[in-house]
């Protein structure tokens, strides 16, 4: 969770039309291959419209610790899905559409911020650099340019957003990041 008192920033980060990258790990029912993920890479049709192409891949048990701390059990598969929309339950619905319902889901990256150093039940203030990244619209994930079959990407870090007549950023960093599992 990301707590902020800046309503414009919140709107810019959360609205599906802003295309902020979100990275999820999912443990799904059934055996899933990279080839099975192709409909998600092309953009899959859900009941509320066509999704933008996702960046996705099957991940191994070592990478999937957030969703499978005791390892990936037989009959399940761990996947990483990177989306730019953020519709309600989008990742769960996308994976269900290809007949692999989600057993466990974890968002591990939001707009370039990672949760790896935030313990469950704790929080920390964002650094000034992280606040700048968020105000610039986040940054694309590292995997976007290096993975075969990746969805087209845009450089969201180069986009500037204007937040009305708000003056300079507050002197005290009021943004919070909190992970609750």
Label each region the model flagged.
Residues 143-181:
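Intrinsically disordered, Lys/Arg-rich low-complexity segments
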Residues 1-143, 147, 179-181:
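RNA pseudouridine synthases
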């Amino acid at each position: 969770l990301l707590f902020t008192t800046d309503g414009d920033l919140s709107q810019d980060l959360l609205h599906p039309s802003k295309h902020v990258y979100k990275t999820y790990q999912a443990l799904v029912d059934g055996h899933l291959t990279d080839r099975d993920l192709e409909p998600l890479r092309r953009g899959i049709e859900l009941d509320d419209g066509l999704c933008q192409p996702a960046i996705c891949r099957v991940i191994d048990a070592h990478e999937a610790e957030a969703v499978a701390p005791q390892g990936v059990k037989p009959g399940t598969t761990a996947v990483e899905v990177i989306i730019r929309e953020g519709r309600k339950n989008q990742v769960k619905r996308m994976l269900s559409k290809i007949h692999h319902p989600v057993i466990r889901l974890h968002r591990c990256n939001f707009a370039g911020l990672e949760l790896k150093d935030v313990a469950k039940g704790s929080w920390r203030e964002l650094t000034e650099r992280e606040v700048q990244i968020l105000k610039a619209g986040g940054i694309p994930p590292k995997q976007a340019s290096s993975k075969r079959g990746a969805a087209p990407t845009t450089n969201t870090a180069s986009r500037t957003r204007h937040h009305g007549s708000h003056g300079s950023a507050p002197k005290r960093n009021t943004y919070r990041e909190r992970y609750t599992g």
